[in-house]
C-alpha cells in the first residue's frame, strides 16, 4: 500500500475549490485522507465549520469506498456524523477510514477525523455501488 499521499481533488469542483484532499491506501480495507484548515473553512466562533467537516468526510470516505468497490462509482446513501471536538486555522486534519463490509450493491464504512491535538468527529456511512467506472 502507499506511504505517500496523493491529491484526489485535481478536477475543478467543490473539493478542489475548498482546498482539496490528499489520500492514501493503507491496507485493502483501511485508508487515510488529510487536509489543512484554512481561513475560509472557519465559522463565526473561530472553529472549523461543521458543513466543511461533513464534506471532507464524505469526499475522503467516498474515495475509500470507491477504491474498495473495485473503482466503481458509488453514491452516498447515509452518512451519520458525531461532532466531538473542534479544529482551527492551520490544523492538519486526518481521516482514518475502515471499510466494514462490501456487498454486491453496498459498501459500509466507519471514519474517525482527528487533528494532532484531538478527535474531531466520528462517522459511519453506507454507499450504493453503481454499474459505472470513471
Language model: regions and residue ranges:
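Terminal targeting signals and extreme-terminal segments of soluble enzymes
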Residues: 1-134
